[in-house]
Amino acid sequence: LLKGVIDCPDLPLNVSRSALQNDGFVKKISDYITKKVADKLTGMCKTDRETYEKYWDDIAPFIKFGCLKDEKFAEKMDDYIIYKNLDGKYLTLKDCMDKAKEEGHENQIYYVTNEKEQSQYINMFRSQGMDAVILKHNIDSAFITHAERYNEHVTFQRIDADLTNDMKDESGEDLTDATNALTDLFRKVLDKKDLTVKVENLKDENVSSMVTLSEESRRMQDMMKMYGMTGMDPSMFGGQETLILNAKHPLVQYILKN
C-alpha cells in the first residue's frame, strides 16, 4: 500500500531499544509515518473504495489497534472505519447509524461475533428486516468501547444481549402464571435458584428458547479473559444469563400443560 524511505541523519548511532524509545527524532518519524499511512488510507477510501474494501479484512485489526494506541490516528480514521454487515456489504459508522434509524433502533448498532453460534439470532433479525455488523476479531471488543467513546450517543450491542421489541408479538396476553410456573420448574431442574426466566410471545414460532446475557456483563467477561482473570467467578460482577421461553412454541406449551 505504501512504500518509501525516510532519511534522518540526526538519529543516534546507539540503536538500543531504550535509547530509541526516548529519542525525539524517533517520535517525529513515528508521527510522520502515522500521518502518511492515515492519509493513504483515507485517500484510498475516498477515491478507490473497491480496493479499500478488498484490503479491509486483512488490515482492519492493525488499523483498529492504531486507533486505540494513537489519538491523532484515530481522529483521522474515524470516518473511514468500515463494518461488514450480514449481507457482506461494507458500511461506515454513519451508514450504520442511518440504517439503525430506518429500522427503529436509532443510535443502537447490533453486532455478531460468531455467525455459526449466533445463527438463530441472525435468522430472527433477518426475518424482521433488521441488520447487524460482523465483529469477530479479538480486538473488536476493545474497539467498540473506543468507538462509543469517540461517537456520542452510539452504542454497540451483540444480537444475543437482549430481546428486541421487533421480535415480540405484543398480543396483550397475560403470561404471569406461565412465567411463574416455568421459572419454578427450570430453577429446580437446572438447580439454579437465581435463574432468571422470561416467557414471551415471539413472532418466530420455530424458536423455542433463547439465552441472553447483557452487553455490560459480556464486556466484563471479555475483559476478565483478556487480562487473565479466568479463575474469577463472573457472578461477582452481577452478570447472569436470562432464559427466554417462547410461549407460542409447542414444546413450551406441552411443558406448561404437563
Region roles according to the model:
Residues L1-N258:
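Conserved GHKL (Bergerat-fold) ATPase module
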